[in-house]
Regions:
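Generic anion/oxyanion-binding catalytic loop in active/binding sites
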Residues: 91-92, 115, 182-185
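Short glycine/proline-enriched turn or capping motifs at secondary-structure junctions
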Residues: 2-3, 187-194, 207-209
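Local sequence-structure signature of Cys/Sec-based thiol-disulfide redox active-site neighborhoods
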Residues: 115-124
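Extracytoplasmic electron-transfer domains, predominantly the class I c-type cytochrome c fold
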Residues: 29-37, 97-102, 127-128, 132-201
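Acidic (Asp/Glu) carboxylate-rich active-site/surface patches
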Residues: 8
């Protein structure tokens, strides 16, 4: 599971100590010292339990930059982030498409990676942010609807590679994206990512019906 994003906590701490108060919809400025202090507090107060290890409170370079720039870095920083993250993507040999039925189960599942879960393959919780099928009774809207993804964009090799890479590490395509870096942070396995790609691409998938 990816390490925790600390910006909401940092923002709350800074907003309580900054005068005058920033507008309600504005993020208080976060500094490197703020990040160090909050990380120190989390390391002090959080404890390893089950599969939830302390590395989850560590920020990597991307998270640090995104926090410092309130998820809206300058163009040169964004380009640097995307290039670095693109280099982390590991494409498997052969086909990038798995089983769409398995992919749908992954997309609908939010289980896994909690301290009290048994270590096993996790779900992707894709429905929390995206519409996946036409008959879903509820879905999130943080991300775009995925209805008709393969029908609209095609399912050729280049689009398969794009979809695999996007699921593997979304920040290779959009710096500071809210989408989890499923492959980079080992939330989903290689086969699971292939299955999600199949969900997006297969003509028989509910995404494309």
């Amino acid at each position: 599971m990816r390490p925790l994003y600390l910006l909401p906590i940092v923002a709350a701490v800074v907003s309580c100590t900054t005068a005058p108060q920033a507008p309600q919809d504005a993020r208080p400025k976060v500094t490197a010292i703020d990040l160090e202090q909050v990380t120190a507090v989390l390391k002090r107060d959080f404890h390893e339990r089950g599969q939830a290890k302390m590395n989850r409170v560590e920020l990597d370079d991307v998270q640090r930059l995104c926090n410092l720039h309130a998820d809206n870095p300058p163009a040169d920083v964004a380009k640097r982030i995307e290039e670095a993250q693109m280099n982390t993507i590991r494409f498997p040999e052969g086909s990038l498409i798995g089983n769409w039925k398995a992919g749908e189960k992954i997309a609908q599942s939010g289980r896994g990676s909690m301290w009290n879960d048994k270590p096993s393959d996790a779900g992707g919780s894709c429905y929390n942010c995206h519409q996946i099928g036409p008959h879903e009774t509820s879905h999130g809207t943080l991300g775009p609807s995925l209805l008709g993804f393969g029908k609209k964009r095609g399912n050729g090799p280049e689009m398969q590679k794009y979809a695999y890479g996007k699921v593997y590490n979304s920040q290779a395509f959009s710096a500071c994206s809210s989408m989890p870096r499923f492959g980079h942070n080992k939330v989903l396995t290689e086969q699971q990512i292939k299955d999600v790609v199949a969900l997006l691409m297969d003509p028989e998938s509910p995404v494309n019906k």
